[in-house]
Amino acid sequence: MKEKKMKYQRYKRGQIVLIDFSPSMGSELRGKHFAIVITKKDSPNNGVLTVIPLSSKEKPYYLDIGNFVSKQVYPQLLNITRELYTALANLDSSDENEYNVEDVQKVINNVNEFKKVANIYINKNKKSFALVQNITTVSKIRIKKPVNHYDPIKNLIADSLILDLVDNKIKELFINDK
């Protein structure tokens, strides 16, 4: 009998993912890091992905790609904040001291869910550096799922300028141009 193959999420080149690189060996990268997907054509049947990890630490051999993460994340977080404030302002009360408990609880739950996401991204207002020399292929199982529906990671993508910088650095580091 034929075994069913596991189906994985499909990722696009340039998409930003959060990967848990632990456990690691020796000097390999460890811990959770954002990474740029560089796989050209991904498939739901493919259980691995080639990525370039990102760091906020500046080192001479890291590629400076600016603060594109915060430039994409902060406007999304600001819009969600506005939506939550609007929801709070729109809580209906027929009496000054009486609110619909279910509506209030729903808004409180949404605020708490949003706080989980905001706490992750709050100190991401820094430059990002691509660790091109650490290009690696990882199991898709290492990719962390979005925290909840407020998590902007599902919408983060490196633009073509950043991908061109990364491609050129890959050529510089790994391709022998004689």
Where would I find each of the regions flagged by the language model?
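C-terminal terminal-subdomain/extension
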Residues: M1, Q9, Y62-K178
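Basic/aromatic-rich interaction segments and small domains that mediate binding to polyanionic partners
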Residues: T39-K59
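Residues located in well-ordered beta-strands
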Residues: F34-I36, T50, L131
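Short beta-strand-centered aromatic/proline hotspots
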Residues: R30-K41
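Loop/turn positions that initiate beta-strands
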Residues: R13-I16
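Active-site-adjacent loop/helix micro-motif of nuclease/hydrolase catalytic cores
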Residues: S27-R30, P60-Y61
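Eukaryotic intrinsically disordered and solvent-exposed regulatory patches
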Residues: K4, F21-P23, V37-I38
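Short, charged beta-turn/beta-strand-edge "cap" motif at the junction between a beta-strand
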Residues: S22-E28, D42
